[in-house]
Amino acid sequence: MEVSRPYVNTVDVIDFGIDKRFFRLPVSGILAQEGITPNGPQIAIINALEDPRHRFVTACVSRRVGKSFIAYTLGFLKLLEPNVKVLVVAPNYSLANIGWSQIRGLIKKYGLQTERENAKDKEIELANGSLFKLASAAQADSAVGRSYDFIIFDEAAISDVGGDAFRVQLRPTLDKPNSKALFISTPRGGNWFKEFYAYGFDDTLPNWVSIHGTYRDNPRADLNDIEEARRTVSKNYFRQEYEADFSVFEGQIFDTFNAIDHVKDLKGMRHFFKDDEAFETLLGIDVGYRDPTAVLTIKYHYDTDTYYVLEEYQQAEKTTAQHAAYIQHCIDRYKVDRIFVDSAAAQFRQDLAYEHEIASAPAKKSVLDGLACLQALFQQGKIIVDASCSSLIHALQNYKWDFQEGEEKLSREKPRHDANSHLCDALRYGIYSISRGK
């Protein structure tokens, strides 16, 4: 287990005193009443929330540790205080119903009187004036208009829009003194949840704290069940769900890419790339308007059969003339031999040719074959990305297969169209259009 702030106790639940702690009622009381003996990650979550130095707690914790269980228990404890508002944000309807049932079960178990219960809007108002609300990250607007004391993001990383939902809609609702937010999840690669997790290690953000735990930190975990899962699920899924590993995730397209092997500082190799006879220089272009237009400059080395990505460009809502100016810059700087553009962007190619005298060819379009080609090249170490191409690196790490609407089932028929698509498409257009087996 790892905690970003070393002073956070992971062995014993600490009482910070009624004047300083977050929960007015002692956490030890609800733990004893419920017969809960918390494990290390659960203790860390409790103490991190109780500590007045923290407002935002990010817990990247694997399955079989009880992160959601302890979070909902703490949310219920907060509701026992008068005139408190607790919001739980869930990524989908299924998880929302689980949380709703857990809170309702605790309210019923302790015989709390309710003034209002709205199953449709997922709201419960208690007789003490406290309110529990459950919302989805995709519809965070439904939760604004109130000031919350405690916001819990359950399985936060599952929703791609959770980060924006918090930054734009929900963080302004934490305007009460000592209001806090808890983000709990298994990871999903390098999305916004990883960014929030990194905040806890930033010394300039002392009110953030991060916790990492796996099934090994739960002494009550069934190791036989864990080993059966290891044998029956994919390697990436096991590392994601049971190791809480940010570096891989189920559905990751370029799981053969890793920054250690495939990202290099190529600035010191300029003399190497100046040998025009040894290289072919390519541009791969994915065209968009509201979506960004992405351009990658790629050097293909004949002798080693290796592709070097030297420069990236990604701009939205620009004119063809503005994109053409950048493309001409690349042509002049890198002596570009061939330009491959999304075959669906015929008008863009025509405008480049007739208005800017830039010739291009339609890229090979087969998506699955092109992705398989790139996967194999990464596996063979045949694609190297310059360290300055930070957006491409992020895209490669987070590009994933699409999910069917409302399901966890992956579709491997097509990639998900999101912010990671554009540079990955440009890479595919540039490389697959000249690759082996053409």
Swiss-Prot record:
Keywords: ATP-binding, Endonuclease, Hydrolase, Magnesium, Metal-binding, Nuclease, Nucleotide-binding, Viral genome packaging, Viral release from host cell. Mg(2+) 1 binds at D286, D418. A motif (Walker B motif) lies at residues 150-155. One of its GO terms (biological process) is chromosome organization. Its EC number is 3.6.4.-, 3.1.21.-. It is an enzyme of class 3 (hydrolase). SUPFAM superfamilies: P-loop containing nucleoside triphosphate hydrolases. Mg(2+) 2 binds at D286, D342. Changing D286N: 50% loss of endonuclease activity. Induction: Expressed in the late phase of the viral replicative cycle. HAMAP family: TERL_T4. ATPase activity requires 1 Mg(2+) ion per subunit. Nuclease activity probably requires 2 Mg(2+) ions per subunit. One of its GO terms (molecular function) is ATP hydrolysis activity. It comes from the Viruses. This is Terminase, large subunit. Belongs to the Tequatrovirus large terminase family. The lineage of its organism: Viruses, Duplodnaviria, Heunggongvirae, Uroviricota, Caudoviricetes. Pfam families: Terminase_6C, Terminase_6N. The active site is at E155 (for atpase activity). Changing D425N: 50% loss of endonuclease activity. Its cofactor is Mg(2+).
